[in-house]
């Protein structure tokens, strides 16, 4: 079967699988002998989980991590055979699906464990679980910081329930990507609690097979964090760095290549005369003859409306073009006065070019993080997968549906 290589050049996201491979290898080199669990939740941060998981599997990933059951089933239906961990909530009623497709669930409280145990027994099997402990994130997990002994007692009780097979232990750092002194201390406290939990479970006869606490910042900054744990059982769990972005402005490594480039095309070019205005609210009025290009993309595709009125920078013909007026749902306008040879159909780079914005600069301009910018690219935007500069596949959710 030939890969789908056809897509409408309206707005699309180019996914550089060579960059993805390079990023994985860079993390692997830093992690040393630690196995890697590649985080592919949220459709691989907007990049396309099926294709990204395929690359990670080829490069030697040991696990894949997702957020929900649907994401796990998508991977299984794409013939993905790597172990899959659901980091978030799963309804116990879906225990049969977890068993059938060999998907590992997070177990994060005794009531949740009991419900999952009952459902697993009714399904006639055992659900594999990784215990999630809350060392300071404040989300799901046995609450070690509130009452360590009580939380460990509940975790041990969960391990003894019929229908459950405890195979792992994990937690999540809340400020590992922050270099403020108090946050460095807080991260160390989280790690110490996690180590303490591991040894408490081991002493009770429930030593986890797999232990993981390192996120992107953790694996890069602290390759020594398996210290205090059984190193042969440890695993790192990188996320955002696999897709080419640093965890935060404070924690930067400068060795990862952004994987996604968001592109669109020019749909019309016109010259606006002094006094003429553009877009909703008439927020832009020309003070001099201005060449304006309309682009066939907008906030419905994931280009933030906060980049209206000159905040956003688009690249056309290698030149920086500021956004004019407000970004619309499906269209936007940019100033192309310095590009006299521009034509309808010309390519425009929304982010990821040499002079355009990046997901990180957009995040700064819109008071968010690169994660949200990447995840915000909507499903009406085809993902175009490239290897060695050539299209190897296209994923178009609208046409597939």
Describe the predicted segments one by one.
Residues 271-401:
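C-terminal accessory subdomain/extension
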Residues 20, 75, 169, 266, ...:
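Residue-level signal for inorganic ion chemistry
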Residues 8-9, 42-59, 114, 118-128, ...:
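Active-site loop/helix belt of alpha/beta enzymes
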Residues 70, 88-93, 109-113, 133-135, ...:
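Short, acidic/turn-prone active-site loops that include or flank metal/cofactor-
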Residues 1-104, 118, 126, 165, ...:
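A charged N-terminal "starter" segment
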Residues 86, 266, 323-324:
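A structural signal for short, hydrophobic beta-strand segments that form beta-sheets
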Residues 73-79, 248-256, 370:
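C-terminal helical cap(s) of enzyme catalytic domains, especially alpha/beta-barrels
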């Amino acid at each position: 079967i030939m890969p789908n290589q056809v897509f409408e050049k309206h707005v699309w996201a180019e996914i550089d699988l060579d960059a993805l491979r390079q990023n994985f290898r860079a993390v692997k080199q830093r992690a040393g002998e630690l196995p890697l669990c590649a985080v592919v939740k949220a459709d691989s941060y907007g990049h396309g989980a099926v294709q990204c998981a395929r690359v990670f599997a080829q490069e030697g990933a040991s696990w894949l991590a997702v957020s929900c059951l649907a994401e796990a089933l998508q991977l299984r239906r794409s013939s993905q055979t790597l172990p899959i961990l659901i980091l978030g909530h799963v309804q116990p009623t879906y225990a049969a699906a977890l068993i059938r497709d060999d998907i590992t669930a997070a177990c994060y409280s005794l009531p949740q464990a009991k419900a999952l145990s009952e459902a697993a027994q009714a399904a006639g099997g055992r659900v594999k679980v990784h215990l999630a402990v809350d060392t300071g994130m404040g989300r799901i997990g046995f609450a070690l910081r509130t009452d360590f002994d009580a939380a460990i007692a509940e975790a041990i009780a969960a391990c003894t329930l019929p229908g459950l097979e405890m195979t792992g232990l994990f937690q999540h750092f809340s400020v590992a990507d922050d270099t403020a002194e108090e946050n460095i201390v807080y991260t160390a406290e989280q790690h110490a609690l996690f180590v303490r939990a591991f040894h408490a479970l081991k002493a009770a006869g429930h030593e986890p097979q797999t232990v993981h606490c390192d996120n992107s910042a953790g694996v890069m900054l602290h390759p020594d964090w398996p210290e205090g744990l059984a190193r042969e059982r440890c695993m790192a769990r990188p996320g955002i760095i696999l897709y080419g972005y640093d965890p935060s402005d404070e924690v930067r490594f400068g060795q990862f290549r952004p994987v996604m480039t968001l592109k669109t095309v020019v749909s019309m070019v016109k010259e606006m005369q002094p006094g003429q205005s553009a877009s909703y609210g008439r927020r832009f009025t020309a003070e001099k003859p201005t060449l304006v290009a309309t682009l066939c993309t907008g906030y419905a595709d994931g280009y933030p409306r906060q980049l209206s009125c000159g905040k956003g920078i688009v690249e056309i013909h290698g030149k920086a073009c500021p956004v004019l007026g407000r970004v619309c749902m499906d269209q936007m306008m940019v100033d192309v006065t310095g590009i006299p040879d521009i034509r309808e159909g010309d390519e425009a780079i929304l982010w990821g070019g040499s002079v355009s914005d990046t997901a990180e600069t957009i995040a700064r301009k819109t008071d968010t993080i690169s994660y949200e910018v990447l995840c915000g690219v909507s499903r009406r935007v085809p993902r175009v997968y490239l290897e060695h500069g050539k299209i190897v596949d296209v994923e178009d959710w609208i046409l597939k549906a």
